[in-house]
């Protein structure tokens, strides 16, 4: 939060200067990126707190639940790394791939929560663990949402056009 406020303050001061159109776009892009990184940090902090709670209360997850958390975590991290790469390199080569992966994460969140309800019904997991599991899965999915926003922050219209074009081409084949 401290860094977010400091960086945002600098960007506001920059925005107050006489900037050309390109520089105004860059400052706007940076606002969006900083905001999304800060939100990812908030969700990561939540996940860390859930992990500490799980540990301190000696809550166990089933192997299936643990595997699902690992799976969605790895996919979320991939979306984040690729989004940062797209941002750093201003290269949209893999944008459709990570957009599809982010959509998969959305679907997995719903599936994993449904699976967890079934585990609770069959007493394979305990209610205290169920709340932590669903909160962690939800926070990971939100991290992927904010991560993909970073990739789209460069030039949302250009990026969206590339994704739509590749989606249409993929459907036509």
Feature-to-residue mapping (PLM):
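Cytosolic, long alpha-helical scaffolding segments
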Residues: 1-173
């Amino acid at each position: 939060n401290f860094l977010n406020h400091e960086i945002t303050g600098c960007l506001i001061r920059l925005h107050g200067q006489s900037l050309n159109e390109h520089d105004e776009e860059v400052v706007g892009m940076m606002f969006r990126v900083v905001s999304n990184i800060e939100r990812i940090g908030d969700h990561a902090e939540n996940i860390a707190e859930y992990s500490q709670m799980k540990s301190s209360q000696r809550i166990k997850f089933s192997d299936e639940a643990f595997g699902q958390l690992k799976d969605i975590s790895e996919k979320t991290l991939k979306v984040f790394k690729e989004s940062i790469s797209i941002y750093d390199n201003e290269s949209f080569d893999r944008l459709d791939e990570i957009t599809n992966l982010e959509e998969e994460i959305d679907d997995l969140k719903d599936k994993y929560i449904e699976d967890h309800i079934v585990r609770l019904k069959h007493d394979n997991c305990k209610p205290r663990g169920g709340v932590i599991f669903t909160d962690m899965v939800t926070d990971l999915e939100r991290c992927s949402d904010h991560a993909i926003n970073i990739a789209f922050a460069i030039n949302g219209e250009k990026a969206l056009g590339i994704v739509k074009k590749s989606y249409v081409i993929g459907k036509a084949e």
